[in-house]
Regions:
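Small-residue-enriched flexible connectors and coil-helix boundary/helix-cap motifs
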Residues: 1-164
Length: 164
């Protein structure tokens, strides 16, 4: 059976609006730029679009300097980068505790104002390791802040059914 890849989408910020691509670079943790940033609550637990639908209104686009440009309704554009001191904090995504880089206070204020709750951004750099569930992976397999696996695919028929 042959399959056709009809579209490629990444979510540079977990749960944000998708970014369509013509092509993508596949890395060990998934597609380049996919879910390398995430919003977390005051305790470090990840926030999703299921809990906070406003996250899905954020448009995120990587720039050539390694920053992430964020746009959201009624908010100024934000250029998101790790804090200059490269401080780290523990983040929790689906029970995985990861040591991630934090953004600066201005970025934390931006996401807190947009969501209406205390929140902050964390970033998965090369030193941040999150292993794939060992029941479904090879030793050493790692993943971004995606729900569980480096690459996620869906059949068009299933997507059509979900959207009907």
């Amino acid at each position: 059976m042959a399959a056709t890849l009809a579209s490629i989408h990444v979510y540079p910020l977990k749960s944000c609006a998708p970014m369509a691509l013509d092509s993508a670079r596949v890395e060990a943790r998934g597609l380049e730029h996919d879910r390398r940033w995430m919003a977390v609550d005051a305790s470090g637990k990840f926030l999703t679009g299921r809990q906070h639908p406003r996250l899905t209104l954020i448009r995120a686009e990587p720039d050539d300097a390694g920053a992430l440009r964020l746009r959201a309704p009624d908010m100024p554009e934000l250029r998101l980068m790790p804090a200059p001191d490269r401080a780290r904090s523990t983040a929790d995504v689906w029970g995985s505790r990861v040591d991630a880089l934090v953004a600066d206070a201005a970025a934390d204020a931006w996401i807190s104002a947009f969501l209406g709750i205390p929140a902050r951004f964390v970033h998965m750099d090369a030193d941040c390791l999150r292993n794939v569930d060992p029941d479904y992976a090879q030793p050493g397999d790692s993943v971004s802040f995606a729900d569980g696996y480096p690459l996620l695919a869906i059949a068009q028929a299933a997507l059509d059914l979900l959207n009907s």
